[in-house]
Amino acid sequence: MLDIQLLRTQIDAVAAALAARGANFDAAAFQSMENERKTLQTRTQDLQARRNTLSKQIGVLKSRGEDASAAMAEVGGIGDELKANEQALATLLERINAFVAGLPNLPHDSVPPGRDESANVEIARWGTPREFDFEVSDHVDIGSGLGGLDFETAAKISGSRFALMRDGLARLHRALAQFMLDVHTREHGYTEVHVPYLVNPDSMFGTGQLPKFEAELFSVMKDDGRFYLIPTAEVPITNIVRNELLAHDVLPLKFVGHTPCFRSEAGSYGRDTRGMIRQHQFDKVELVRIEHPDASWAALEELTGHAEAILRKLELPYRKVVLCTGDMGFSAAKTYDLEVWLPAQKTYREISSCSCTGAFQARRMQARFRNTQGKNELVHTLNGSGLAVGRTLVAVLENYQQADGSVVVPKVLVPWMGGIEVLEPRG
């Protein structure tokens, strides 16, 4: 959530930054609500001052034995107007807060301008795509040939955009997630957390999914309210610090969690309908950091490097891009995407998105720390995929496929596969 004082004092600069994101910001509507707020507050203050003056006069009149009925009647009228103003102001502040809650984060100064993904800037590549001496297959055909990837049964059970995995492929999927968790906890210093997959509306608001993106979420209604299936572990993990006041010396907090993620994929009709690239349910290992404001931008570079380390250990070619202003997520101030090479598509596809949100989520969550001067200050929050497990599986299948339909297990994964070095096609 943006700082409302920034909107009040630097509205032109905010409008320009939001325009660079392609966000719809009605400055006139905000100014109108602000003018109404100021008028109400000024009138309320005037009435309170008049009531205080009259109360003193009533005391003097009564002490003299004089008639105070007129002054008392005026005080009663003021009380009625104050009550009406209080209700009107509360309603107006709700409108203002809802308006501000619908505005995305402001881009960091280092973010390149642009309207869409075509303006994203590649800043690095790692690895050389493998040259095949046979016609490559995509992950769907490879997985089916291994007898481990079954979309037909998944569709019978649930519908489109679901996958069922069996045997060696299911084990490889599990091994990837465990490998990622072990690297991030043992080598990168993250604390593993196991979190709920259903969260309340306050949690979704805190990380920025609500109210703007409700159509993209799955939810269930129970007697004690509505719960949402998490679209990413960023939601429950980041909300660990909602409404918390932390000591400055506990920062940074570094969390990692492995969860399924659930997305309706509203607006993606017809895109990536084949295979596991775009699913309603998929697994992800998520990195979340709670940082001191002075350390958050360096932390973004480090967090992104931790996600890159997984790709390098798996020896998967990838590229790193910084997203332009028009392609960033709602809560992000700056985002790096990591895109892995998929031989069957002959292109790089997103496998990780790493973002710093600054104080944007912290303000929505009221996540604060007490600084060295003893003052309360908002933390900064960061998140990133480390990595999307299903897409990593896709990349392994396609990059490690062999001419006979088998798939070589990446060397680094063999211990997590119980010594299995090759997945053989079914006979």
UniProtKB/Swiss-Prot annotation:
CDD domains with a match to the protein in the record: SerRS_core (cd00770)
Catalysed reactions listed for this entry: tRNA(Ser) + L-serine + ATP = L-seryl-tRNA(Ser) + AMP + diphosphate + H(+); tRNA(Sec) + L-serine + ATP = L-seryl-tRNA(Sec) + AMP + diphosphate + H(+)
GO biological process: selenocysteine biosynthetic process; seryl-tRNA aminoacylation
Keyword Lipid metabolism: no
Main location: cytoplasm
Localization per record: Cytoplasm
PROSITE patterns the UniProt entry points to: AA_TRNA_LIGASE_II
Pathways per UniProt: Aminoacyl-tRNA biosynthesis; selenocysteinyl-tRNA(Sec) biosynthesis; L-seryl-tRNA(Sec) from L-serine and tRNA(Sec): step 1/1
Coiled-coil residue windows: none
One function term, GO molecular function aspect: ATP binding
Domain of life: Bacteria
Annotated L-serine binding sites: 232-234, 286, 385
Keyword presence, Protein biosynthesis: yes
Cross-referenced Pfam families: Seryl_tRNA_N (PF02403), tRNA-synt_2b (PF00587)
Protein residues bound to ATP: 263-265, 350-353
Database matches in PANTHER family: SERINE--TRNA LIGASE, SERYL-TRNA SYNTHETASE
Function: Catalyzes the attachment of serine to tRNA(Ser). Is also able to aminoacylate tRNA(Sec) with serine, to form the misacylated tRNA L-seryl-tRNA(Sec), which will be further converted into selenocysteinyl-tRNA(Sec).
Domain characteristics, as noted in the entry: Consists of two distinct domains, a catalytic core and a N-terminal extension that is involved in tRNA binding.
Quaternary data: Homodimer. The tRNA molecule binds across the dimer.
The protein's name: Serine--tRNA ligase
Source species: Aromatoleum aromaticum (strain DSM 19018 / LMG 30748 / EbN1) (Azoarcus sp. (strain EbN1))
Lineage: Bacteria, Pseudomonadati, Pseudomonadota, Betaproteobacteria, Rhodocyclales
Gene: serS
